[in-house]
Amino acid sequence: MAAGYRSPTACGRSPLASEGALGIVRFFMLFSVFYLSLFLSVGLLLARRAVPDGSAAVIVPLGCGFGVSLLAVLPALFAVVLGFTLPTVILAAAAAAGIGAALLYRGTRLRGMAKDPDSGALWACLLPVVLITLYLLHTHVLHLVDGAYHTGQSCYGDMPMHLGFIKYIAQSGEFLPRYPLLGGTHRFGYPFLCETVSSVFVVLGADLRTAYLLPMLPAFLSVYGMFWQLARRVTDSAGKACLAFYLFFMGSGLGFVYFLGSADSFAGIFTGFYTTPTNFVEKNIEWVNPIVDLLIPQRATLFGWCVLLPAVYLLWRFCYEGERRLWPWLAALVLPLPLLHTHSALALVLLCLVGGVYTLAQGLRRKTLLPWLGLAAVCGAAWLCQMLPTVLAQSLDGQHMLRLHFNWINGQDDGTLRDNYFWFYIKNIGLVYLLLIPAFLRAKPKQRWLYGGGLAILALAEFVVFQPNNYDNNKLLYVWHILGCILAAQLLVDIFAEVRALPWRALGLAACCFVGMFGSVLTVGREALSDYRQWSADDMALADHIDENAGSDALFLTSDSHLTPVFALAGRRILCGSGSYVYYHGMDYSAEYNAMRALYETPDEDTLAAWDIGYAVFDSSVYAKFAADESWYAARYDVWYENAACRVYKIK
C-alpha cells in the first residue's frame, strides 16, 4: 500500500479553496433547512385545519407529523415518473407550496390558537428527553473526531445501512429503487420512504450528515409531543400524561438486578458492548430502551411512529370522541405509512379494526359508518398501490418471512420457551406489566376499547412473525406497550392521589419510578458514554473518490463487511452486502455470496463479466475473511485508487 498517499479530494486544498468549499457546504445546508421548513410550515397549516381547537402544544407536534408525511409522499409521487432527481425535488416543493397556498386561501392561519394551561407541562416533560436525544444524535451520526467518523453503541450496526440507502437513492436517481446490497436486479422490499426523506437533501446538495439528521428532528418532536398529547387526551390529565411518557421512553424492567452483585458487574454496564439492564441477551433481557435502541438507530421505527402516534391521537378523537370530520385528515396523514414503517401500518390497522367494532357496537347509523368506509377506501387503495410491488410482495415470496412462532424471542424453534411466559415479560417490562390487569379493570370503557386494539396487536405479534428476525416483532409489541403505559400511569396517579400524607405519596411514586425506570437510566448513561470509530480518514477518502469518479450505476466487488464505505458512505451498489442486512430483509443471497468468494479466492474474467463488476476493492476486511488473490487482478487491471487502507482495481 502507498502509506504516504493523500487523497486529492480530502487533503491538499489551499486555504482559499477550503474556505470556498465550506461556504458552498453552508449554502446547501441552509437551503436544505429552508426546504424542510417549507414542508413543516404546510404541515402546521394542515394540523391547524384538522384540529382548529388545538393549542400550539398540539399543533406543533401534529404539524411535524403532517410535514414529515408530506416529505415522504410528494417527492415519491413525482419520482415515479421522473426518477429521484432534482426536478422531482423541486416539483415536490412546488406542490407543497401549492397546498399551503390553498390552505391560506381557505382562511387557515397559525395565529389565534387556543390557550392551553397544560402546555408548560408538556414542554417541561419533553425537555430532558429532547436534550438527551440531541446529544446522542450529535455523537452517534457521522461524528468527526480526529479526522475519522465515530458513533455510539446503538448506531454501529444499523446506521451504515441507512446511510447507504439514502445515498444510493439520491445518487442513482432510481425510483422505485433496486436493492443495492446485492448484484443483479432485486426488489427493494424494505420500507424505503424512511430513507427518501433524507435523500431529498442529498439531491439538494447537503452533506450526508445534514441530510441524515434534518428530518429526524421534526420526527422526534412529533413522536414525543404526540405521545404526550395522546396520553393526556385519553386520561384527561397532564400529570398522568407526564408519568406515562417516562414509563414508556425511560421505562425498563428488572434487568438492573443482574448487575447489582458486584462493583465490577455494575461497572460493566458502562464499558461492555450491549451488556445493559435493557439489553442483556445472556439473561434473556431484550426489552430495549425505545430512545437509544429503537428511535435513534432505526429510522423506519422513528418515521413510522412520527406518523403513527399523531394518527392514534386523531383516531381517538375520530372514533371514541365522535369527531367524524377527522377521517380525511387521518387518511391524508397516514398515506405513506406502509413504506415508512410497515409494522406501524399493521398496528394502525388493528387499532382501527377494534375502533370499528366499537363504532358498530354503538349502533348502525349512516353518519358513523360512512366515515369509516371513506377511511378504509382511501387508505386501502393508497396502501395497496405502495405495498404490492414492494413490502407485501417481499413478505409473500421472501426468504423466512411470514410464519408462525410463539412468544417473540422467548420462544424457541422447537416450541419450548426459554423462560416462563409471564416471568419473561415481568423481568423485561417490569412494573407496567404487573399493573396491566388492575389498570385495565380501573380504566373507563373507551380506554378499554383502545387498549383492546393493543391486545389485538399483542395477540398477533405473539403468534405470527412477519420477517426473518423474530426480534423485529417488537415493533408491534411496543405499540401495545404504549397503550399499557398510559393505563398504568393512570392507575398509579389515581392510587397515590388517595394517599393523604404528601410525603408518603411522593415516596411511593418515587419508589415506583425507580423500579420502573432505573434500568433505562443506566442504559441511556451507557449510550451517552459509548464511542467507537466507524470509518477512518482513508475510508472517507475512498468514498470521496468514488463520489467524484465512479458512475452512479457502478457495481463494486467488496467484502461483505457492514461497514464497507463503498456502500455506506458512497452509496454505490456492491455484489454482496452483509448477511446481517440481506438475510434479515428476506433475500436469497447465496449466488452473490458464492460469486464474491470466488472472485476473491479463485477469480476469472467470465464471472466478473457475468456479474458486470466495475471495480474490485482490496482492504483489511477482504483479507480478514478470504484467501484473496490480489495478484491476479494486479496482473490484468489498473489500480484505479489507492491509499493506506485499500486498493481498488478498475475492471471495465
Question: What spans do the regions from the language model cover?
Answer:
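Active-site lumenal/periplasmic loops and adjacent helix-entry segments of GT-C-fold
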Residues: 130-307, 342-346, 532-533, 560
